[in-house]
Amino acid sequence: GAEEQVNALRETTGVPAGSTSLAFAAAITQLGFRRVGVLAPYPEPAARAFVAFLKEFDIKVTFLDWLDAPSGWDSAAMDGEVVIERVVEVSQTSADAILVPDTALPTLSLVEEMERRTGQPVLTANAVTLWQAIRLAGGSVGYTGYGSLLGGQ
């Protein structure tokens, strides 16, 4: 799985390595969240595979919605306002945070607005990947304009 891939990369290269999926699990665990809502850009089978991955880390998904983007190109072309509106819908469920996987979906500039509208932490693939990379490099977060995770809150 993901942990074996990261370990193989680390051993082969001799440098820290990570993955977006593991970054989601690490961020959720560090922040103490147990129940999350998910808005996945993927088709349903891929969205359900992400939920199964989270379950391996004892993370409960209280609500799952998907946008049926057939490819990364389609994710990248999605209207940001549509994504925000769907995140707001997911936030109406009993979750500690909202997750938006898929690094092809350009969400980093949307995170703060999503959190403002939902009143909840929103963890996106790009944000957790950047958060993990900063930590692996020995840095710390505290960046404004990119949501609570990268803001260090």
Where are the regions a protein language model picked out?
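Non-catalytic structural scaffold of enzyme domains
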Residues: G1-Q153
